[in-house]
Each structure stands twice: as C-alpha cells, then as structure tokens.
C-alpha cells in the first residue's frame, strides 16, 4: 500500500465558484473525495491539503518524507510561477511528483507560461479540468507499480 499526498495551492479552496469558465464547477471537496475513493479502491492511502500560505505547503512537503509518502500530486496554482521555495522543498525530499493545473496555463496570460516545477516533475497535466487530478493519480499509481 502506497501513500499519496495531494497539495492544492492558493485560491483552490474557492473552486466551484471562482471563475467557473476557467476552473470549472467542481468543488475542491468533490475532487478530494473522488481521489480518496479511487486511491482506496486501488488499495492505497491518499492525504490532501489546501493552503493559501506557501510556508504551510512547504512544511507539509517536509513532513511527507518522514511520514513515508510515496508520491505527491501538486497543483501549486499561482505559486507555479513564483515559488523557488516550493520547488526546493520538493527537490529536498526526493519524493516524485506530478504537477497538475485545471486550466491550460499555456493558453492564458504570458506570465502563467513559466513553471518552476515542470522541469523537475515526473509529468505535467494541464487544461483538463478536474479530470486532470484523476489522470495524475492514475499516472502516479502506474509509476509506483513500475518501481
């Protein structure tokens, strides 16, 4: 049994009501519930945290190593384009991760095109809405099965 951690960055607590044309109508609670059910059905344990505070996400990443987390799914949200600290935390713990974005960041404002995570992630999924989380989970489980 593997343990997976899903991290949601700033403003994702507003999913379902925040710019539904961009981010969809699915709530964060619905995304988390779906991922928990899928992980459990596959015989794994899934944890999740949403925070608007960079330091809380960093602290959670640090704790993940001592807790034996095997894989991380992260939607850094706006921190994607700004946070060297989150990138460094992920590199420091050496836990593989997949970067997830609800919207296609490459079809949006130019400042959203750069990610501090993509080049060190196992993979990146963007533009598929809430389904992107499901696909990231499936990919993570495949990666874990192959290792």
UniProtKB/Swiss-Prot annotation:
It is an enzyme of class 4 (lyase). Pfam families: DHquinase_II (PF01220). Its EC number is 4.2.1.10. It catalyses: 3-dehydroquinate = 3-dehydroshikimate + H2O. Pathway: Metabolic intermediate biosynthesis; chorismate biosynthesis; chorismate from D-erythrose 4-phosphate and phosphoenolpyruvate: step 3/7. InterPro entries: DHquinase_II, DHquinase_II_CS, DHquinase_II_sf. PROSITE patterns: DEHYDROQUINASE_II (PS01029). Keywords: Amino-acid biosynthesis, Aromatic amino acid biosynthesis, Lyase. GO terms for molecular function: 3-dehydroquinate dehydratase activity. CDD domains: DHQase_II (cd00466). Substrate binds at residues 75, 81, 88, 102-103, 112. GO terms for biological process: amino acid biosynthetic process; aromatic amino acid family biosynthetic process; chorismate biosynthetic process; quinate catabolic process. Homododecamer. Catalyzes a trans-dehydration via an enolate intermediate. PANTHER family: CATABOLIC 3-DEHYDROQUINASE. This is 3-dehydroquinate dehydratase. It comes from Stutzerimonas stutzeri (strain A1501) (Pseudomonas stutzeri). The gene is aroQ.
């Amino acid at each position: 049994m593997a343990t997976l951690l899903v991290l949601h960055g700033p403003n994702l607590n507003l999913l379902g009501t925040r710019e539904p044309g961009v981010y969809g109508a699915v709530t964060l609670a619905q995304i988390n519930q779906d991922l928990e059910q899928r992980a459990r059905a596959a015989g794994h344990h899934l944890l999740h945290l949403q925070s608007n505070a960079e330091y809380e996400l960093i602290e959670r990443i640090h704790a993940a190593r001592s807790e034996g987390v095997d894989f991380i799914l992260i939607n850094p949200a706006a921190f994607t384009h700004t946070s060297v600290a989150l990138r460094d935390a992920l590199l420091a713990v050496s836990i593989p991760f997949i970067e997830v974005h609800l919207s296609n960041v490459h079809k949006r404002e130019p400042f959203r095109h750069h990610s501090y995570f993509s080049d060190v992630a196992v993979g990146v999924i963007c533009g598929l809405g809430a389904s992107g989380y499901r696909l990231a989970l499936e990919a993570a489980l495949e990666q874990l099965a192959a290792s």
